Amino acid sequence: LDIFSFWDSGRQNAPAAVQTCLSRWEEMNPEHRLVVLDARDMADLLSDMPFDINLLPVQARSDILRVRLLRQHGGAWVDATLLPLLPLDRYADVYTGKTGFFAFAGPPSHWRLGNFFLIAHAGNAFIRALDDAIRAYWTHPRQLYDLRIQPTWPPGKKLTIRALLTKGMGKGYLDFFTRWRADLLYPVSPLGRQGDYFPYFWEQYLMMQLIDTDPKARAIVEAMTYRHHDLCHMVQNAREHFGPDFVRTVPMALRCSPVQKLDWRVDWPPEVFALPAEESILI
């Protein structure tokens, strides 16, 4: 099983938090190969795109890359800022189960899948369908949707997205997302994709649309082992909510999931990189 990751300027130039995360993946998974790609690798792998891939922000290019890699090779995708707390073999089979696919997810009522950590067996039907959908979406370069500009999006959609960004998480977010689902998915709809703008979470929305329209894709996701994506953000959430006192919450936060998503721009204290006892970590 290959473990894929990406840092645009190369692993050797990555910031300290990224270096620590990547090294931890190697240390914990000696039976598996960690492949860290850079901008040149990406350009080669995505050379069949119908436009210069470098016209897109690096985050969008990385979104395309991860699905392409998993379609071609199978394996696991891990964001470079994803801190592992357990060896992959401890939970990979549990997570992929009979579907051969796993992504952390939001509430099943709207099936918003995260893409910061993905596992897919070679030839997995969901990944194949998603890669096909991505190719169909990126027929031309688009500009990242910026709330400060007036895009070709209908004004109502602009207000909807702004409201979403102020809702936060929890029940308010869930109610809002359920009510405005069609509007949020507008950019990847047949009409919305004719424009020249795309939202930051375009790939997550495209996965949701795929689940809505492709019975086979939906069956895979509904049979997938369910783990809520919020469990992977407990360390970051603690830092945002508790400020300097968050360090006291770190031991508990680290036990919530086999992986924790970090922000590479933050100077994380050493407590964040301390390993809890394996048996205490939720799988």
Question: Predicted regions: what is each one?
Answer:
Residues 1-63, 78-283:
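Glycosyltransferase-associated regions of secretory-pathway enzymes
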Residues 63-75:
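Small-residue hinge/turn detector
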